[in-house]
């Protein structure tokens, strides 16, 4: 039976080894039996360039390479934490990078995939920040900086982001319903799968089904399994 897995918001980092362990277990036990695995952003807690090296990164690269070498496809859509993950990483691991929005035929259902941050248009400050950091010229300049300086800048941005979240209402950090429906209609989709909000749920909207992936924590994972029988969270 053909099976697809969807995950997002693992926020892999050295301070939470249990989450890395859970991911590696998933890669060893479930992923090898899949037709494809889709990682929908914020895979890493932050990513400052494909030249960064660590034990965690090496473990993840090895697991991805082993999976793709076995014939299982692995696709990646960047999130707001790992949008600098690039072609070098993709070549090293065998994953395929996708655009911000990707349309997939999933057992006859037109399914739209995205990280989810682009749907949260009510968070105006974040959307302004996103437009700036996605400028290719600015990214090129940042990646030109020494690795140690990039780490300091990323840590500063992350601290500010955490502080800003405390001052934002929960509503503006969720998707805008009208914009989301418009985007789904634009792609002619019947289903939408996204992450980012950390609010695992299935929403049966008027003309489509919206499936939200949850974030990973030391005590639980959020894995969406889709096969010809339907979908379920593991």
Swiss-Prot record:
Pathway: Glycolipid biosynthesis; lipid IV(A) biosynthesis; lipid IV(A) from (3R)-3-hydroxytetradecanoyl-[acyl-carrier-protein] and UDP-N-acetyl-alpha-D-glucosamine: step 4/6. Signal peptide: none annotated. Substrate binds at residues 80-81, 123, 161, 165, 168, 196. GO terms for molecular function: manganese ion binding; UDP-2,3-diacylglucosamine hydrolase activity. Mn(2+) 2 binds at residues 42, 80, 115, 196. SUPFAM superfamilies: Metallo-dependent phosphatases (SSF56300). Disulfide bonds: none annotated. It is a peripheral membrane protein. Mn(2+) 1 binds at residues 9, 11, 42, 198. It is found in: Cell inner membrane. GO terms for biological process: lipid A biosynthetic process. Its cofactor is Mn(2+). Its EC number is 3.6.1.54. It catalyses: UDP-2-N,3-O-bis[(3R)-3-hydroxytetradecanoyl]-alpha-D-glucosamine + H2O = 2-N,3-O-bis[(3R)-3-hydroxytetradecanoyl]-alpha-D-glucosaminyl 1-phosphate + UMP + 2 H(+). It comes from the Bacteria. CDD domains: MPP_YbbF-LpxH. Belongs to the LpxH family. This is UDP-2,3-diacylglucosamine hydrolase. The gene is lpxH.
């Amino acid at each position: 039976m053909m099976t697809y897995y969807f995950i997002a918001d693992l926020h892999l980092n050295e301070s939470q080894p249990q989450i890395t362990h859970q991911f590696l277990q998933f890669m060893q036990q479930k992923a090898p039996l899949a037709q494809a695995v889709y990682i929908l952003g914020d895979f890493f807690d932050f990513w400052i360039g494909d030249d960064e090296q660590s034990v965690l990164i090496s473990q993840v690269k090895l697991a991805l390479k082993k999976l793709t070498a076995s014939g299982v496809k692995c696709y990646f859509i960047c999130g707001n934490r790992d949008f600098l993950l690039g072609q070098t990483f993709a070549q090293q691991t065998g994953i395929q990078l996708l655009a911000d929005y990707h349309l997939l035929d999933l057992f006859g259902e037109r399914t739209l995939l995205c990280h989810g941050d682009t749907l949260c248009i009510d968070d105006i400050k974040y959307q302004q920040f996103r437009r700036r950091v996605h400028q290719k010229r600015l990214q090129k300049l940042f990646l030109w900086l020494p690795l140690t300086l990039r780490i300091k800048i990323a840590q500063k941005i992350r601290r500010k982001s955490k502080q800003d979240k405390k001052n934002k209402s929960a509503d503006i950090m969720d998707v805008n319903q009208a914009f989301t429906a418009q985007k789904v209609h634009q792609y002619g989709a019947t289903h939408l799968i996204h992450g980012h909000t950390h609010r695992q749920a299935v929403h049966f909207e008027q003309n489509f089904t919206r499936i939200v992936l949850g974030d990973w924590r030391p005590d639980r994972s959020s894995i969406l399994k889709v096969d010809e029988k339907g979908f379920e969270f593991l």
